[in-house]
């Protein structure tokens, strides 16, 4: 076991605070409409440019191990805020730095760290309740666009795209962000159910100009196994040929003789057929086949339930108004399923989401809900260079998560104003600690709540104290604040400067939680650096060569 290096008391806390300040100072330059970018070096390729707090934090490692522990704990604040609400990472970092700095000053002055933490926790609990009172629902498309605009660094086009996407596919729909091939941003909405499986043979293509297959009013055969023998499908193919309707086969796989026969019959014009692999793997594939069955009023042919493909009838086939198949994706539009069955299926999946433990499972279940109910929207992000593209894509993804948070818990006035209002209300309330040290903890938290506004103002090149005091005057309007972009005072909601309540709440709670742990730290332990032993390369003479000098 490696030997350890230990630091205690103020020595430990000073080192930790130094690490906190290094990371926070790098992150907080990005805050607000006039925040700056940070350039991150990469081990290969071009550096990346970002204005996203958590991206900056994740990239920082310090050489001094004690300082690095402080930086890593602060990094956790940004990561937790990002995981919870998708935004507010820089705000959380600024709040945590302020709480740690003021808290450690109080500890150095002789206050009890545990009581300080209890005071901070009391102030934060009260602040969360006040934020809920200040919050307003966000259902209007205009407000959703404003939240997206603010989160995307005042990019109005991005805010509008996100608002349009949410309107088209509902709040539960899947919205993804992809890189565009050109310079322009755009929105593509896929109606119906789409899954990422394309045609098994290009010979099925019937639209040469788009290299795709398009069927109107097709039958849909769903099979939970590989199909390799064409004889298993003869009865179904006869029914389809007689009716003159196209057939889409969705199975685990279609291979060998079965695929070859389908291709030949399609090319001869005997039947219109296309085959694709079922989406997903394992149990997830079975569930997704059931989703398609419910959507199309079909039945999954599965040996597990005693079904046989040979005995399948027309009653087992699903139907849809239209199907479009490309080499990468299959889209089923306007399935013939009953609305009540689809809704029941959606409710069932929602219950699974509530019980799911992993983020991956939740995401996949959410996608299934969206495909059954809302559809899928793709926001295409364009930029002139790859570096700009990556930076913009990250901003749009943040903005998308922020708008979802706004719809979930509502909005509060942005620009750091909500926390200023909350702090003022708590300061004027009857909130008190059990002792004077707890009261100091409450004051530490309330002072920290001013720090986001102050940092936004500093980044805009203005005097923080003057503007903070003017905003505190309130003028009888809780929404009264300072617009750093236009350098004007006014109603933040009317000016379109909104923050999702969830983002502000999460930033404050995670900042206070981690900062409280740092304040109560008394000892830090790390591995001692290993000393590299220089290999013994000095010549001590070679055995048996003692008389070499005399050879000359």
From Swiss-Prot:
Its EC number is 5.6.1.7. It holds the Pfam family Cpn60_TCP1. Forms a cylinder of 14 subunits composed of two heptameric rings stacked back-to-back. Interacts with the co-chaperonin GroES. It is found in: Cytoplasm. Belongs to the chaperonin (HSP60) family. Gene3D superfamilies: GroEL, GroEL-like equatorial domain, TCP-1-like chaperonin intermediate domain. One of its GO terms (molecular function) is unfolded protein binding. It is an enzyme of class 5 (isomerase). The gene is groEL. This is Chaperonin GroEL. It comes from Hamiltonella defensa subsp. Acyrthosiphon pisum (strain 5AT). GO terms for cellular component: cytoplasm.
């Amino acid at each position: 076991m490696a030997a350890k290096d230990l630091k205690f008391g103020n020595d430990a806390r000073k080192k930790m605070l130094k690490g906190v300040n290094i990371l926070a100072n790098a992150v907080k330059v990005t805050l607000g409409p006039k925040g700056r970018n940070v350039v991150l070096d990469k081990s290969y390729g071009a550096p990346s440019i970002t204005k996203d707090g958590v991206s900056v934090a994740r990239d920082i490692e310090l050489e001094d191990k004690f300082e690095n522990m402080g930086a890593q704990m602060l990094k956790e604040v940004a990561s937790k805020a990002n995981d919870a609400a998708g935004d507010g990472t820089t705000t959380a970092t600024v709040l945590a730095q302020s709480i740690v700095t003021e808290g450690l000053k109080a500890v150095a002055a002789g206050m009890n760290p545990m009581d300080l933490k209890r005071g901070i926790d009391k102030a934060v609990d009260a602040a969360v309740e006040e934020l809920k009172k200040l919050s307003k629902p966000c259902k209007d498309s205009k407000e959703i666009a404003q939240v997206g605009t603010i989160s995307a660094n005042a990019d109005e086009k991005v805010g509008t795209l996100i608002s349009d996407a949410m309107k088209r596919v509902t709040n539960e729909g899947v919205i993804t962000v992809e890189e565009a091939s050109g310079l322009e941003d755009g929105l593509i909405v896929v109606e119906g159910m789409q899954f990422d499986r394309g045609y098994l043979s290009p010979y099925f293509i019937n639209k040469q100009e788009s290299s795709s297959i398009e069927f109107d009013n097709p039958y849909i055969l769903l099979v939970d196994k590989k199909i390799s023998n064409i004889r298993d499908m003869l009865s179904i193919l006869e029914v389809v040929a007689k009716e003159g309707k196209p057939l889409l086969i969705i199975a685990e796989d279609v291979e060998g003789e079965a695929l070859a026969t389908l291709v030949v019959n399609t090319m001869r014009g005997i039947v219109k057929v296309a085959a694709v692999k079922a989406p997903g793997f394992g149990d997830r594939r079975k569930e997704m086949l059931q989703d398609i069955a419910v959507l199309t009023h079909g039945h999954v042919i599965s040996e597990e339930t005693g079904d046989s493909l040979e005995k399948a009838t027309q009653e087992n086939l699903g139907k849809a108004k239209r199907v479009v198949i490309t080499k990468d994706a299959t889209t089923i539009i306007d399935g013939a399923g009953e609305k009540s069955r689809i809704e029941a299926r959606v409710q069932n999946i929602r219950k699974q989401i509530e019980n799911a433990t992993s983020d991956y499972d939740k995401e996949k279940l959410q996608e299934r809900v969206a495909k059954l109910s809302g559809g899928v929207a793709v926001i295409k992000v364009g930029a002139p260079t790859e570096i700009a593209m990556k930076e913009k894509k990250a901003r749009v993804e943040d903005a998308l998560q922020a708008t979802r948070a706004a719809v979930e818990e509502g909005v509060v006035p942005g620009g750091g104003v909500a926390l200023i209002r909350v702090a003022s209300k708590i300061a004027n309330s009857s909130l008190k600690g059990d002792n004077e040290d707890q009261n100091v903890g409450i004051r530490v938290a309330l002072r920290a709540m001013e720090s986001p506004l102050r940092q936004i103002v500093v980044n805009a090149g203005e005097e923080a104290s003057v503007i903070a005091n003017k905003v505190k005057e309130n003028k009888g309007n809780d929404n009264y604040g300072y617009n750093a972009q236009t350098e004007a005072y006014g109603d933040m909601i009317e000016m379109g400067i909104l923050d999702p309540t969830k983002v502000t709440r999460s930033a404050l709670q995670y900042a206070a939680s981690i900062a409280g742990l740092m304040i109560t730290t008394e000892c830090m332990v790390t591995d001692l650096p290993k000393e590299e032993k220089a290999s013994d390369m000095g010549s001590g003479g070679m055995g048996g060569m003692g008389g070499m000098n005399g050879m000359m």
